Amino acid sequence: MSDLCPVYAPFFGAMGCTAAIVFTCLGASYGTAKSGVGIAAMGVLRPDLIVKNIVPVIMAGIIGIYGLVVSVLISDALTQDHYALYTGFIQLGAGLAVGLAGLAAGFAIGIVGDAGVRGTAQQPRLFVGMILILIFAEVLGLYGLIVALLMNSKATLNTSC
């Protein structure tokens, strides 16, 4: 073990892996629950619109996939031998980037999905506007995924221990 590769270096990579999946799944579950409540309330009055308005729930679920992708990439690089502290910090940052972006995107999708679904039941022309706002909310999570993938690609460069 050297100063560049201490014994505790893989801990930071493992925390990045954990942060990626935990925070994105928190956002996805909040978005799913909040949108699902709106769909259930809307379905009482307009059951014909339930399938059409399931879009926010699907978009919230996609947020969890972003965290899964980054988590798998980080866990694939985790080793006990020859793991640099630099790699651990970069992978922690990658996990936090996708995780917190996914958490924010999930909150936005849940709030917009709930209000949009309820509004669509009263005024069907609101559907297109709801979809556009949901796309912008989903892109927030995608930004975190892109940053995490770029960071993780830098972490796996040759580091000598």
From Swiss-Prot:
Record's bilayer topology term: Multi-pass membrane protein
Subunit: V-ATPase is a heteromultimeric enzyme composed of a peripheral catalytic V1 complex (components A to H) attached to an integral membrane V0 proton pore complex (components: a, c, c', c'', d, e, f and VOA1). The decameric c-ring forms the proton-conducting pore, and is composed of eight proteolipid subunits c, one subunit c' and one subunit c''.
Protein name: V-type proton ATPase subunit c
Species of origin: Neurospora crassa (strain ATCC 24698 / 74-OR23-1A / CBS 708.71 / DSM 1257 / FGSC 987)
Biological function: Proton-conducting pore forming subunit of the V0 complex of vacuolar(H+)-ATPase (V-ATPase), a multisubunit enzyme composed of a peripheral complex (V1) that hydrolyzes ATP and a membrane integral complex (V0) that translocates protons. V-ATPase is responsible for acidifying and maintaining the pH of intracellular compartments.
Keywords: Hydrogen ion transport, Ion transport, Membrane, Transmembrane, Transmembrane helix, Transport, Vacuole
Lineage: Eukaryota, Fungi, Dikarya, Ascomycota, Pezizomycotina
PANTHER family: V-TYPE PROTON ATPASE PROTEOLIPID SUBUNIT
Chief location: membrane
Residue intervals on the Cytoplasmic side: 32-53, 114-125
Marked site (Essential for proton translocation) residue numbers: 138
Lumenal side: 1-8, 75-91, 152-161
GO molecular function list: proton-transporting ATPase activity, rotational mechanism
GO CC field: membrane; proton-transporting V-type ATPase, V0 domain; vacuolar membrane
Listed transmembrane segments: 9-31, 54-74, 92-113, 126-151
Family the entry assigns: Belongs to the V-ATPase proteolipid subunit family.
Pfam family, one: ATP-synt_C
InterPro entries: ATPase_proteolipid_c-like_dom, ATPase_proteolipid_csu, ATPase_proteolipid_su_C_euk, F/V-ATP_Csub_sf
Cellular compartment(s): Vacuole membrane
